[in-house]
Amino acid sequence: YRLQNNYNNFKNGSTCGGPCVNRKEIIYAGANNGILHAFESSNGEELWGYIPPNVLGNLEKIPSSKANSTNAIYGVDGSPVVKDIFFDDTPNDGSTNPRWRTILLGALGAGGHGLYALDVTDPDNPTHLFAINHDGTQQVVQHWDVDGNKNEFGYRSGNIDPQYDYRKLGETWSTPRIIRIKVSGKDKWVAVFGGGYNGAVNPNYGSAVFIIDLEDQGRLLKVIDIEDQANVIHNYVFGTVSNNTQTEFNLANYGLTSYDISCCTLKVYGAGSIRYSITGDQNGNTMNNLKLRFDEAPPGGITLMVSKVNKTDIVNSIPADLSVITADGTNKANYNGAMVYATDLEGKVTKINLTDKGTLYETTTLFNSQSTSDNGRYIYTRPEVTINNDSNLWLY
């Protein structure tokens, strides 16, 4: 691939603000004040700082009314990654001109539900590529394109353009990995990362793996749901009318007449940040006459889902980095693309196929520790991967 696309010409050329082979070595580091810093490694000099557009709105929260103190916003809390990729970095100029560029991709970590990307081919002159932000409270996804134009995509109605469906994106603790995969037989540069942290309280986001298109300004290719795969007993799906004012729903009307509280619990999806409760009449371990009540009427025309799941007090999410196996990392990988391994707070290990062998995006649960708050089997870290001499892969 690199030979076919003249990678050596790029490495030996002068598109990096000078000869690329002699390009400055830069240390990129995010800070809780909301700034990504670029330091020259040879002398520690700071070359520049960058505030991503999805962080700007939080800066006003830093000043504190208390003397000699500030409020922490966590800002640019995630670790950035840098890689050379071959793509058209000027997609809005009416022509297609792919070339090798060095891109930096960063996640906000505890600073928010978002990512940002820069072109750092010339380390003295970085340029903005795109940024993404998910606001779960306002139920909106924000996207800044390569020209800095901001577009918003609300989903209170339950619908959103699939290219911007970041509804399940939590705090982006999971460091993105930049890889090249085959999509419809063509090479494509993508980033893959976990859905992040949800505070262990919000089931609406965090339990997914995202694959985004780096050649198309961060638009989505695929969201793979990892949520409660082993625990869901049944889903009850219904919707609100277009001019909805209803705050109470009789769940028997949608097929949920009762459940056993000794083994099961109910989870509600689709209402965003609207507070709710489920009430009923208890007879022993059985709850009957179930009512779903919201503090305010949900928006009209949305889809709601009540899931009956095996009893667990864990709200699942994927805060850990992913383990990604590519041919760049081992000669045992006889495929294009990557094999990805994700861990989650439910204690599961999931394999995701992003190779050209088998079915693209196929998932397999390899391990389930059945974690609870009592046994504490949460997994916050990525699995360590090794390949032994007879080509067997081991996860630790």
What are these regions (language model features)?
Residues 263-297:
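Extracellular/luminal ectodomains and secreted, surface-exposed scaffolds of diverse proteins
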Residues 1-239, 251-254, 258, 262, ...:
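A fold-level detector for beta-propeller and closely related beta-sheet-rich head/sensor domains
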Residues 244-246:
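Solvent-exposed, conformationally flexible loop/turn segments
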